[in-house]
């Protein structure tokens, strides 16, 4: 799976006695080649009446196009995350314009966490951890360790994982945006 430079997006879900906690976060760095052009970008957001969390890695304009299309699919399928993701991927693979978009999405709701790629993949990683972008592997490793060995909330795990990724990945900064369900 191709990883795009310039960001880290991580989502964590944790089962607690009070219910499922879901959080997603991303850094704010935008690069153009080897130059940082913005440090405060917002790459994660809530969709579908605040019931779905989404983040992107890749070309910003492409990602916003995908967010719009994905939200339309969520509306069409009454918020069913997996169905909307599959339908978006079908369009992404078959539409001439969409096929050229260079971005990946990480999405989550109360029942599932998914990675959506332009290669036609809708992936549901194990353990409720989703990570994309150049710092994704660092954040994923940190989240896995924290999820397994601590009682931290999903939001706290996302924040700490982003901080660790920011220390290791030159394309990830320390300005983080985190959303929770």
Swiss-Prot record:
Allosterically activated by HslU binding. Na(+) binds at residues 166, 169, 172. It is found in: Cytoplasm. CDD domains: protease_HslV (cd01913). One of its GO terms (cellular component) is proteasome core complex. One of its GO terms (molecular function) is metal ion binding. The keyword Cytoplasm applies. The active site is at residue 7. It catalyses: ATP-dependent cleavage of peptide bonds with broad specificity. PROSITE patterns: PROTEASOME_BETA_2 (PS51476). SUPFAM superfamilies: N-terminal nucleophile aminohydrolases (Ntn hydrolases). InterPro entries: ATP-dep_Prtase_HsIV_su, Ntn_hydrolases_N, Proteasome_sua/b, Proteasome_suB-type. NCBIfam families: ATP_dep_HslV (TIGR03692), PRK05456.1 (NF003964). Protease subunit of a proteasome-like degradation complex believed to be a general protein degrading machinery. This is ATP-dependent protease subunit HslV. It comes from Delftia acidovorans (strain DSM 14801 / SPH-1). The gene is hslV.
């Amino acid at each position: 799976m191709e990883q795009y430079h310039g960001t880290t997006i991580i989502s964590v879900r944790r089962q607690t006695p009070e219910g499922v906690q879901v959080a997603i976060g991303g850094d704010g760095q935008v690069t153009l080649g080897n130059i940082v052009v913005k440090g405060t970008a917002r790459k994660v957001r809530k969709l579908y009446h605040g019931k779905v969390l989404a983040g992107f890695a890749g070309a910003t304009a492409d990602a916003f196009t995908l967010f719009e299309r994905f939200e339309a699919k969520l509306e069409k399928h009454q918020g069913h995350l997996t169905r909307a993701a599959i339908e978006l991927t079908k369009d992404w693979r078959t539409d001439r314009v969409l096929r050229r978009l260079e971005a990946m999405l990480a999405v989550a709701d109360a029942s599932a966490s998914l990675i959506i790629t332009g290669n036609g993949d809708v992936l549901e990683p194990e353990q409720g951890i989703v990570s994309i972008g150049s710092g994704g592997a660092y954040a994923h490793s940190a989240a896995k360790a924290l999820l397994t060995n601590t009682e931290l909330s999903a939001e706290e795990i996302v924040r700490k994982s982003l901080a660790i990724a920011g220390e290791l990945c030159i394309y990830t900064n320390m300005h983080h945006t985190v959303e929770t369900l």
